[in-house]
């Protein structure tokens, strides 16, 4: 049986509302959720907050509908980048950034989208759904992102709220699918209220409208989400690890870098 995930429940100052989001997600059958803290740099030296602790939300975790297991709550950081300088916080491997289970980036220009796909150490690249896409997707950076294991995220709650956003969501999603062919795509809610979350099978049906095949639409709320989580674990654990290889010791007689006269002396 598939394990469903919603990797974008919006964090807010109201913990009671956040509890309601998590409880509703568990009731709808989601086994994993991520509480998303979104940062948009309006000041040069803006601090990244620590993630919300699960212990602050629940003493006992809600049970997933039909699973008899408690829901798993992860933390996520999304950084909106509209200027190249905003990427520095990711390149500097900030200690606050490493506290989050998932790190996503929302690039606002084509150049920053290219950088996010090819260079930034992130798990997700967010696709705009609330306005017309400001650039065309190109195959090379998207293929690099797929090879690196980076996912692409589409949000569905804006499409529920507004008919204009619905058109943008479907149009931008179809443009993405033409290039990535449904690979590494996840669909999340970005829900701020419990009523904005839909069940995983309903979300998979929305995926068909976004241009995904039936199998890719289901993967967008299950296996592709798991791949993002594994990518995040690898990113966190691989930081600071150095691989060493022991070089076999060679005798002076076998060393080609020695002068011929010295090598002859060694052999004698």
From Swiss-Prot:
GO terms for molecular function: ribonuclease P activity; ribonuclease P RNA binding; RNA binding. Pfam families: RNase_P_p30. The modification Phosphoserine is found at residue 251. It is found in: Nucleus, Nucleolus. Keywords: Acetylation, Nucleus, Phosphoprotein, rRNA processing, tRNA processing. Disulfide bonds: none annotated. One of its GO terms (biological process) is rRNA processing. InterPro entries: Pol/histidinol_Pase-like, RNase_P_p30. Gene3D superfamilies: Metal-dependent hydrolases. The keyword tRNA processing applies. The modification N-acetylalanine is found at residue 2. GO terms for cellular component: nucleolar ribonuclease P complex; ribonuclease MRP complex. Component of nuclear RNase P and RNase MRP ribonucleoproteins. RNase P consists of a catalytic RNA moiety and about 10 protein subunits; POP1, POP4, POP5, POP7, RPP14, RPP21, RPP25, RPP30, RPP38 and RPP40. Within the RNase P complex, POP1, POP7 and RPP25 form the 'finger' subcomplex, POP5, RPP14, RPP40 and homodimeric RPP30 form the 'palm' subcomplex, and RPP21, POP4 and RPP38 form the 'wrist' subcomplex. All subunits of the RNase P complex interact with the catalytic RNA. Several subunits of RNase P are also part of the RNase MRP complex. Component of ribonuclease P, a ribonucleoprotein complex that generates mature tRNA molecules by cleaving their 5'-ends. Also a component of the MRP ribonuclease complex, which cleaves pre-rRNA sequences. Belongs to the eukaryotic/archaeal RNase P protein component 3 family. This is Ribonuclease P protein subunit p30. It comes from Bos taurus (Bovine).
């Amino acid at each position: 049986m598939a394990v469903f995930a919603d990797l974008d429940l919006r964090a807010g100052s109201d913990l009671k509302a956040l509890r309601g989001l998590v409880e509703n997600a568990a009731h709808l059958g989601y086994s994993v959720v991520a509480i998303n803290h979104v940062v948009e740099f309006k000041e040069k030296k803006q601090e990244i907050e620590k993630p919300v602790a699960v212990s602050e939300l629940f003493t006992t975790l809600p049970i997933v509908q039909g699973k008899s297991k408690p829901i798993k709550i992860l933390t996520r950081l999304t950084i909106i980048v509209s200027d190249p300088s905003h990427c520095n916080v990711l390149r500097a491997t900030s200690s606050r950034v490493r506290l989050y289970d998932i790190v996503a980036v929302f690039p606002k220009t084509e150049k920053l989208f290219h950088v996010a796909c090819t260079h930034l150490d992130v798990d997700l690249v967010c696709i705009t759904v609330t306005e017309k896409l400001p650039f065309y997707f190109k195959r090379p950076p998207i293929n690099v992102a797929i090879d690196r294991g980076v996912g692409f995220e589409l949000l569905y709650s804006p499409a529920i709220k507004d008919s204009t956003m619905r058109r943008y969501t479907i149009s931008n999603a179809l443009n993405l699918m033409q290039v990535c062919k449904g690979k590494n795509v996840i669909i999340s809610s970005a829900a701020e209220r419990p009523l904005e979350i839909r069940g995983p099978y309903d979300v998979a049906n929305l995926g068909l409208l976004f241009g995904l095949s039936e199998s890719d639409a289901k993967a967008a709320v299950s296996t592709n989400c798991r791949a993002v989580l594994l990518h995040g674990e690898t990113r966190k654990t691989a930081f600071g690890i150095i691989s060493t290889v022991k070089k076999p010791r060679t005798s002076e007689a076998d060393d080609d870098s020695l002068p011929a006269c010295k090598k002859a002396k060694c052999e004698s």
